[in-house]
Amino acid sequence: MIRLIVTFTFLFLLSNLSFAQNKSSSIDFKKYLRKPSIEISYGLSGLSINGNDNNLANAGMIEMKLGFTKQNISKYGKNIINYRNNYLFLRNASSDNYSRSDNPGLSNDMWSFGVGDKKGYGVKTGNFSILPYSSNSFAWTQLTYDQTFATPDEIQALADFDGSFRFGTSTEAGINFQITQGFSIQPKYEISDVYPRSLFGKQLMSSVIEYSGLFLIDGFTRQIMKNTPVAGSFVNFVLRNAYEYGFYQLRKNQMNWPFTSVAPLRYNTFKLGMTFTF
């Protein structure tokens, strides 16, 4: 597994570097320049299946993202920034990372890795920028937990997830406060679903519906930004993330909504992160 992650990371970095280097003379290189970035986060996760926590204790999440970040002046104004970050991530959410006396339940441990993309528009003043964003990712996740005190119903509910890597998706809303050139902090909230089984056709169609909605929202907010770019940056943030939150609420009971399917294992996580851009 470690070899797979290392190989995956190497190919990702190589592809981005190749893109930056292999440019034609007709392309504005600075427009497409992406800078390497490292993001480190800590958060608190609540676990549930169909709204039931199945007696799983809350987990402290530690996460690292390696990626490439692009910030360029948008066509909507000199102080409006178009922000995008493509990344690989590795995370561990464990009850051992959140050792408190008021955290009852079954001890658990989760490892997850995957790829993601975050984007948004922000406002820049000198070296300080406010960059609200939305993010989507695909992940492979393994959950293990202590069955010593688990009931038969709890064991049955978690049987499809225990000890195996499962595919899943997530959405994240956050605000990137760039304090100075190359350093920023982000408060953020993530909903991450882990699927007990893969149903490619239903998953594909559910994702097509989800991203079609995002495409329409992007078109709508672009019209707002033509007239009021600062307000449009935050309208884009609110609409995209409100839409994703609603869509994931519909998926809480059916992982491939609107198609009949079972409930996913869900992580709801509040996080605080910091990013170094080189």
State the predicted function of each range.
Residues 1-33, 224, 278:
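Cleavable N-terminal export/targeting peptides
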Residues 21-81, 85, 91-97, 250-278:
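Short glycine/proline- and aromatic-enriched beta-strand/turn motifs that initiate or cap beta-hairpins
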Residues 40-42, 62-72, 111-123, 136-138, ...:
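Residues on the lipid-exposed face of transmembrane beta-strands in outer-membrane beta-barrel proteins
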Residues 48-56, 92-104, 143-156, 197-204:
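Outer-membrane beta-barrel translocator domains and adjoining extracellular loop/strand segments
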Residues 72-77, 127, 177-185:
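Repeated loop/turn-to-beta-strand initiation elements of outer-membrane beta-barrel proteins
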Residues 77-150:
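Gram-negative (and chloroplast) outer-membrane scaffold detector with strong preference
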Residues 180-278:
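Predominantly the C-terminal beta-signal and adjacent terminal strand-loop region
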